[in-house]
Amino acid sequence: MTTQVPPHSVQVHTTTTHRYEAGVVPPGARFETSYEAGVKAASIYHSERGPTTSQVLAVLAGLPVGGILLLLAGLTLAGTLTGLAVATPLFVLFSPVLVPATVAIGLAVAGFLTSGAFGLTALSSFSWILNYIRETQPASENLAAAAKHHLAEAAEYVGQKTKEVGQKTKEVGQDIQSKAQDTREAAARDAREAAARDAREAAARDAKVEARDVKRTTVTATTATA
């Protein structure tokens, strides 16, 4: 008697991944046509790229403001050109008065601006110096020593400058004295030369007068003898 072996059951489990051959449509699947896919992609693109609310509000607020500003720019340009056309003949007629007045006003304004700039620069310099001194000083107990040191340096600098100024003043005085002496000597020399020249001219004139008198006397004596 033969023994029968029961058949083995084999279970096959399908995976979640499927591979379909070209042209084979699985049951229950639906493929979109190219037209439907294009329309859907265009609608998605336009929905993503469409203007937002903030952009619409910005356009609605910017267009009136830009138009008003452009209108004001045109009106301002027209008014400026009209005023220039009207003021040019008047400026030509009254230029002898307006030009000096304009120059004077410009110089005054420039003077005020220059004075203010110098004042602000000076105040800024003082503020910077004070801040620099406050930052560079190590501690409060060294302030007195630093101040004494700075005062000593300032006194030494002033003394040196005073000595240099005195030396220069002395040199200038000596130069002036030497120039004055040279001037006096030149004046005395010129006076002596002038006196000698006058004496020579007087002697020559006297000699001419004496010669003329002698000649006249000789002529008179000759006439009397004849």
From Swiss-Prot:
The UniProt record lists the keyword Transmembrane helix: yes
Region spans: 2 X 7 AA tandem repeats: 159-173
Region (Polar) residue spans: 1-76
Amino acid composition bias (Basic and acidic residues), ranges on this chain: 164-173, 181-216
Any one GO CC term of the record: monolayer-surrounded lipid storage body
Annotated Low complexity bias: 217-226
BP-aspect Gene Ontology terms: lipid storage; response to freezing; seed oilbody biogenesis
Superkingdom as given in the UniProt entry: Eukaryota
Keyword Amino-acid biosynthesis among UniProt keywords: no
Family per similarity comment: Belongs to the oleosin family.
Protein name: P24 oleosin isoform A
Organism annotation: Glycine max (Soybean)
